[in-house]
Regions:
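Positively charged n-region of N-terminal signal peptides that target proteins for export
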Residues: 1-4
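Hydrophobic membrane-insertion alpha-helices, especially the h-region
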Residues: 6-22
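Polytopic transmembrane helical bundles with strong interfacial aromatic enrichment
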Residues: 20-23, 139-141
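Electrostatic cytochrome c docking/interface patches
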Residues: 26-47
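The canonical Cys-X-X-Cys-His
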Residues: 47-59, 109, 131
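Acidic helix-start/capping segments at beta-turn-to-alpha-helix junctions
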Residues: 61-76
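Extracytoplasmic electron-transfer domains, predominantly the class I c-type cytochrome c fold
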Residues: 72-118
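C-terminal capping alpha-helices of c-type cytochrome domains
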Residues: 107-108, 115-141
Length: 141
């Protein structure tokens, strides 16, 4: 029993020390400079629900994005997502925009781990099809 207490104390100490590492706390949202031409407000709303937290400058940072080590993962995912496709910076080249329809069609996006934590991002089959069709028209290959 004493061993469990020692291990628990060490783990707690490690978690506390992890909070001192500044990585993962850059919760900034740069300005939106230009969005794509959305075919309808409905399509934009679907993209906001399923894509914008990682693929825009309008990220809604969840509480766990401030707690290491989850904060490190969240910041990494957002940085990576914005780097691949950023719906807030269409004044800059978005070379992966053409892949958006295929990613949604194949179930690669939104990521399963994200949907598990953000149920509102789960798309019905009809919503998924609508987003695929819109992305295919907006970002032709």
């Amino acid at each position: 029993m004493k061993r469990v207490g020692i291990i628990g104390g060490v783990l707690l100490a490690v978690l506390v020390v992890m909070q001192l590492v500044p990585k993962g706390r850059n919760h900034t949202n740069p300005p939106v400079t230009q969005e794509p031409a959305w075919p309808s407000p409905e399509v934009r709303a679907l993209a906001v629900r399923a894509c914008f937290d990682c693929h825009s400058n309008e990220t809604k940072w969840p509480w766990y994005a401030s707690v290491a080590p989850a904060s490190w993962l969240v910041e990494h995912h957002v940085e990576e997502g914005r780097g691949e496709l950023n719906f807030s910076e269409f004044d800059k080249p978005q070379r992966h925009a053409k892949d958006a329809a295929e990613e949604v069609r194949e179930g690669e996006m939104p990521m399963a781990g994200y949907v598990a934590l953000h149920g509102e991002a789960k798309l019905s089959e009809a919503e998924k099809q609508r987003l695929v069709e819109a992305f295919a028209a907006m970002f032709p290959r």
